[in-house]
Amino acid sequence: MEDASLMCWGDNSNGQLGDGSRSERHVPISVPLGGAGVHEVSSGSYHTCAIMADRSLRCWGDNWHGQLGDGSFSDKLSPVDIEIPSNSSAVTVDSGAFHSCVGMNDGSMYCWGYNSYGQLGNGGTTRAGIPMPVPLDSTQSPTDIQVGLFHSCALFDSGEMSCWGDNAYGQIGDGTPISGGWHLPKTLVLDHEVLSISVGHRHSCAILTDASLQCWGI
């Protein structure tokens, strides 16, 4: 919205609309944010996360797997502040089916929620109810993060792209599908630098600097 407010509508069984209820809404309703403006919003299957105008992070809705990041594992019907263990500002956020990831302006990246396929990128498969750091090359800074069903991808300011998590259908893009998934980010080998990325449930796509489009997965 022009005034940086946020409006949501549709299913609200887990409080994903953020209006303090579980009632579905058939027309857009305003999300109460105490006058704070919204910079970016991302909706998962049953939860929502937003970067505020001051670059802080709030999430709400389904929290069964800890995908809100507040450490509680209980649904939140209204936006709650998410504490990122970094003295930096949120740049980009994406909400997947049951996990979320955020990139910070100091080049760090954090993920939380469901992790059975390593989609949090921290080397393990244990779910996390609070943001967990993703180990990255110190020379890279994430400019975009895209989260699928059970995998995640990030675009860096270097023009490189990394993916991690479920790879049963080749959605990581390294040419070696495995059912267990990759638990740490893997840098993809592409013909050119990457301009833009998008991730679906079980596939991924990238626009390259030669204006070509490449996709993989199912």
Language model regions located:
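Surface loop/turn motifs at the tips and blade-to-blade linkers of beta-strand repeat domains
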Residues: 31-33, 83-85, 135-137, 188-190
